[in-house]
Structures are given as C-alpha cells and as structure tokens.
Amino acid sequence: MESRKEKRAFLIGRFQPFHKGHLEIVKRILSENDSIIIGIGSAQYSHTVVNPFTAGERHLMISRTLEKERIYNYYLVPIEDVNANSLWVSHVEALTPKFDIVYTNNPLVRRLFMERKYEVRSLPMVNRKEWTGTKIREKMIAGEPWENDVPDPVVEVIHEIDGISRIRQLSTTDEDITQ
C-alpha cells in the first residue's frame, strides 16, 4: 500500500497584527493542505508605526489564536528580511521545513518562488475593506474600535504588551511631545 506524501504549504506575512482575514486564509489553506508553515516576515522590525509588534509578540498572537481554533498542524517561523531578493527564497528554505506550495498575492514573492519552480497560488481577499493591518493600526491610533477585526487572543496579547499605548506613542512626532 502506497503512502500519500504530506502536502505542506507556505504563507508569509508581517501580521502587524494577525487579524481575522489572516485566520480565514490559514483555514482555507489548511482545507487544501495537510499542514502550513506561517512565516512571520520582517521579523527584525518592531516599534515603528508600520511594524509595531516584535516577532515574538506576533508569534504569541498567532499561536494563541490557532490553539483557540484547535488548529495544530502548523509551524511558525520568524523570517528576517535579506537585502538581496535573489537570495531570499534560499534564506526562507534554510529557515523552514520543506514545503510544496506557496500562497501569496505579493508580486515579488510570487515571482521569486516561481523562478525557483514552486507552485504558487493566489490568496482570496477576505473583507479587505476592514481587515488590513494598516486599517487596524490606524483605528488603534485614532482610538476607534478595532477589537472586532482581530481574534480574541490577539486582543489579549495587545493588551498584555500595552500595544495600544505603544503604537499611539510611535505615531507622534517630537513636535507633538514638546507642545
């Protein structure tokens, strides 16, 4: 009897923060694959308005969410940027378990993996008007409700790390502080 090869997918994102659209995408990818590697991209960046959370904080957001959803067939891998696009896929391969298929809508990521002969699939956009990291961060800064845009464990992590205060402070300029 021939055993079936496990099909493993790769997804990369900054997840600043991990939101309900990301969760839906993970579920859809897992409906087509046995397991998923979630690359926490730009892992070296934190404490900026665009990248307010550390790789470790994003890891907590994602792992707690997936645990609550009873999803266990995943790997979380922090992936730092490299300054040479031609080397990036090799960098990813060195950091992750082997994978068969890549899911992305990013044109550069798509191109780089296709050049290395990976199967690359597009992701469905889920409630893109509300569920984007940029929009959620803007809501946090403006004091608007954002909690319904992210899974409950993400809300908990952001409160634990005082993330709202952090992103609001990061969004001010030195002129704001001196006035």
Swiss-Prot record:
It comes from the Archaea. InterPro entries: Cyt_trans-like, NMN_Atrans_arc, Rossmann-like_a/b/a_fold. Pfam families: CTP_transf_like. It is found in: Cytoplasm. Keywords: ATP-binding, Cytoplasm, NAD, Nucleotide-binding, Nucleotidyltransferase, Pyridine nucleotide biosynthesis, Transferase. Pathway: Cofactor biosynthesis; NAD(+) biosynthesis; NAD(+) from nicotinamide D-ribonucleotide: step 1/1. It catalyses: beta-nicotinamide D-ribonucleotide + ATP + H(+) = diphosphate + NAD(+). GO terms for cellular component: cytoplasm. Its main location: cytoplasm. One of its GO terms (biological process) is NAD biosynthetic process. One of its GO terms (molecular function) is ATP binding. Its EC number is 2.7.7.1. Belongs to the archaeal NMN adenylyltransferase family. This is Nicotinamide-nucleotide adenylyltransferase.
